[in-house]
Amino acid sequence: MQFDYIIIGAGSAGNVLATRLTEDPNTTVLLLEAGGPDYRFDFRTQMPAALAFPLQGKRYNWAYETEPEPFMNNRRMECGRGKGLGGSSLINGMCYIRGNALDLDNWAQEPGLENWSYLDCLPYYRKAETRDVGENDYHGGDGPVSVITSKPGVNPLFEAMIEAGMQAGYPRTDDLNGYQQEGFGPMDRTVTPHGRRASTSRGYLDQAKSRPNLTIRTHAMTDHIIFDGKRAVGVEWLEGDSTIPTRAAANKEVLLCAGAIASPQILQRSGVGNAELLAEFDIPLVHELPGVGENLQDHLEMYLQYECKEPVSLYPALQWWNQPRIGAEWLFGGTGVGASNHFEAGGFIRSREEFAWPNIQYHFLPVAINYNGSNAVKEHGFQCHVGSMRSPSRGHVRIKSRDPHQHPGILFNYMSHEQDWQEFRDAIRITREIMHQPALDQYRGREISPGVECQTDEQLDEFVRNHAETAFHPCGTCKMGYDEMAVVDGEGRVHGLEGLRVVDASIMPQIITGNLNATTIMIGEKIADMIRGKEALPRSTAGYFVANGMTVRAKK
């Protein structure tokens, strides 16, 4: 089998590349996905309100686990990643947050990455998006990804929480992806107008999969990339339960889009990475790149949960006797409780003036429950998910064997810097202050978690050690740049090799301020133009907010 391009991973970026490259009818593409199809009849992945279900099983989730995290009381922590057409866009929380403009301007400070500034990237965010309330300088109107924004009147808790943030002195913003990210406001979400999850499989692959020049193989577990000297010339994979490898040749390039956990794994198994690690497993060295699998970053978050004094939370939706009606309303009408992920409000703040742009993110949820659906509080409640955005902690991903089915060693080194502890203490105390504003007086009951007895630095730190969880945003393990730990250049091309790119969240040099999916899709769009030799979209001229030393919040 021969193709112009072989794409490994049909996820948030891989599906973008498959769709854009096959727009040229003379270009042939093989798309390999280790998981299965995104079954449209499976409510677990298609119903926004069911977002916790895929994280509870292994059909759509790699369900990785970290090594014992040394600063988190040696907990082994969850590291869910999407498996199936759509990748993590098939199982994520559907929050469409691009990050802060200054995140990208910060990337562009690195020599060789100058064209990754916010204004260079904004046209690609817009190209990918169709927003339900119409296009403008910041939002697209005819892209493959359906984005809906929260409307007033969904649940009184959302407006009360935004109002409470303002009463605490923080700004309101009507668009967390627009001129000003900083502040509290409605959340954009990747949901279709018919109340279905808008994964990249639905948005991109649906328009491309019938093209004769695109071949899609599911249940295809990539073993390694085949090299001829320093040139990537093909891929070898295992299909289904078979132990006999299948091969295909790439006439032009191999495009690795397997995500921040699997992409470095595949490079290491293919002989690209730290020479000492590869020698441990008798893997012939193709090219030494010590940065492969290093620079691992994530967002850590925790929940502050409160009893709700009025019966306006989603607690009744968790009762089994209400779920058939909710399911029917969603299935036949695309409406009701099932048609939302219920992260309809959130915000970004600076906890201290020394941060040039927001370092704390909020997601508001009108029910008290863990992200993966466990430990639901058996009463009306609500919660804030809160976490720091740009932790200095760094971890790694390293293979444990040559077997592609064996999970790698993953260590995030969560909370390994004093800055981490300071940010989380600040975040808990600020959140409590917001929760005690007048706007929430009629709703706020007792604090369920952490509980009012948890007050000192030592008590807060212990709560974080025991209860903080991943926000499922790993990135950075094949970072873009030109220093000695960089893996790819500014076009995703692997240093020192030919015919091989990495295009996914692993190439982010530094994690962004917000959820990763929108930016991963943007990366796919931007590098697709580079691969095709197309001129980059014209740089945007839109303005954007820079705090520039402004006070963190208005004085009361």
Swiss-Prot record:
The question of whether Flavoprotein is a record keyword is answered with yes
One GO term describing the cellular component: membrane
Which pathway does this chain act in?
Amine and polyamine biosynthesis; betaine biosynthesis via choline pathway; betaine aldehyde from choline (cytochrome c reductase route): step 1/1
Q: Which GO terms describe its molecular function?
A: betaine-aldehyde dehydrogenase (NAD+) activity; choline dehydrogenase activity; flavin adenine dinucleotide binding
Q: Which residues form the active site?
A: H473 (proton acceptor)
Requisite cofactors: FAD
Read off the InterPro entries from this record: BetA, FAD/NAD-bd_sf, GMC_OxRdtase, GMC_OxRdtase_N, GMC_OxRtase_C
Q: Looking at the record's lineage, which domain of life comes first?
A: Bacteria
Function in brief: Involved in the biosynthesis of the osmoprotectant glycine betaine. Catalyzes the oxidation of choline to betaine aldehyde and betaine aldehyde to glycine betaine at the same rate.
Q: What is this protein called?
A: Oxygen-dependent choline dehydrogenase
Which species does this protein come from? Answer: Escherichia coli O6:K15:H31 (strain 536 / UPEC)
Q: What is the lineage of its organism?
A: Bacteria, Pseudomonadati, Pseudomonadota, Gammaproteobacteria, Enterobacterales
